[in-house]
Amino acid sequence: MPETFVSLVGNLTDDPEVRFTPQGTQVGSFRLAVTPRVREGDTWKDGETSFFRVNVWRDLATHVGDSLSKGDRALVVGRLKARAWETPEGERRSVVEVEAEEVGPSLRWATATPQRANGNAKADTGTGAGSRKGGRR
């Protein structure tokens, strides 16, 4: 069955929750509120907000927990995953969640200083804002 990938940009509704499975694997989750902008005549208005539960695993869970918090604007790329279960009362429930491959802060209205997972800050290789020293384009 083909997988469905999505790219989302929205705001965290709460701080990410990071925990461990019984096997010791890090797992985290957060809710992302995504509100499209809709043009009505000469003005732009907020459209209907959609809420997505985003799951992150292993090191990504730790990095998200250390880097993002409630209200932060974030970008998420991941797979849609449908999950179904039955409650103790016998009711069938289902949910569609996003299993994230990539998560990062939005730089539209904020700045960030990337720091490698080993604790070393990303080296400044340029001579000023927007520099592309080294020929990478």
Per-segment meaning from a language model:
Residues 6, 10-12, 26-28, 50, ...:
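Hydrophobic core residues within well-ordered beta-strands of beta-rich domains
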Residues 15, 35-39, 59, 83-85, ...:
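Short coil/turn motifs at secondary-structure junctions
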Residues 13, 17-19, 57, 81, ...:
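Conserved positions in beta-strands of structured domains
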Residues 1-4, 16-24, 39-45, 66, ...:
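Acidic, gly/ser/pro-rich intrinsically disordered tails
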Residues 20-33, 94-97:
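Short aromatic-glycine-enriched beta-strand elements
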Residues 8-12, 32, 70-82, 100:
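OB-fold and OB-like beta-barrel modules that bind single-stranded nucleic acids
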Residues 48-59:
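Beta-strand/loop nucleic-acid-binding surfaces
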